[in-house]
């Protein structure tokens, strides 16, 4: 395993643990570094075209995959509703309905899901999710429900 993969794996394993322990918001310095990093990564795939159309079946398939793999950090609605650590991570977990996220092309969204965003807590899913699952998640991201309209993840309500 390469050093980069080892470090990425360690960050992914430790990030949720540290997020749960964190009692204070990120410092101004942490937030500044995270913001700069987030906005200076190269997101590839701009011209890649999603082979899945926005049909009811494809949206439902994307929702199922999203719920299985993405809901823990992004909430049921993709807008962090009910996720207790979403704002305390550095950088905070973005709302997937935000203009910032929605301005990405479908191919760019797939690339982010494939490769993740280092050094944030966003893991890459290439090898875990199939291309079909990822493309269906992208379809779902284009059709997210209204914030808070589907409730909170049960795992955080206990």
Enumerate the language-model features and the residues they cover:
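C-terminal motif of bacterial Sec signal peptides marking the signal peptidase cleavage site
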Residues: 18-20
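Sequence/structural segment immediately N-terminal to covalent heme-attachment motifs in c-type
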Residues: 56-79, 86, 109
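Flexible coil segments in periplasmic/lumen-exposed cytochrome c-class electron-transfer proteins
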Residues: 26, 44-45, 67, 120-158
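Extracytoplasmic electron-transfer domains, predominantly the class I c-type cytochrome c fold
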Residues: 89-143
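Electrostatic cytochrome c docking/interface patches
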Residues: 28-65, 157-158
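Bacterial signal peptide processing site
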Residues: 22-24
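Short, flexible, mixed-charge acidic loops at enzyme active sites
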Residues: 37-41, 83-89
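Bacterial N-terminal signal peptides that target proteins for export
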Residues: 1-9
């Amino acid at each position: 395993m390469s050093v980069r993969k080892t470090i990425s794996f360690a960050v992914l394993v430790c990030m949720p643990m540290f997020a749960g322990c964190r009692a204070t918001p990120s410092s101004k310095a942490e937030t500044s570094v995270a913001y700069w990093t987030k906005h200076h990564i190269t997101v590839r795939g701009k011209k890649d075209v999603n082979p899945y159309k926005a049909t009811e079946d494809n949206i439902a398939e994307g929702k199922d995959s999203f719920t299985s793999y993405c809901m823990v950090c992004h909430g049921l609605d993709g807008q962090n509703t009910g996720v207790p650590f979403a704002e305390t991570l550095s950088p905070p977990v973005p709302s997937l309905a935000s203009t910032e996220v929605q301005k990405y092309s479908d191919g760019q969204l797939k690339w982010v899901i494939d490769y993740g965003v280092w050094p944030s807590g966003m893991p890459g899913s290439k090898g875990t999710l199939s291309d079909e699952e990822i493309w269906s998640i992208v379809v779902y991201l284009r059709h997210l429900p209204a914030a808070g309209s589907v409730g909170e993840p049960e795992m955080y309500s206990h």
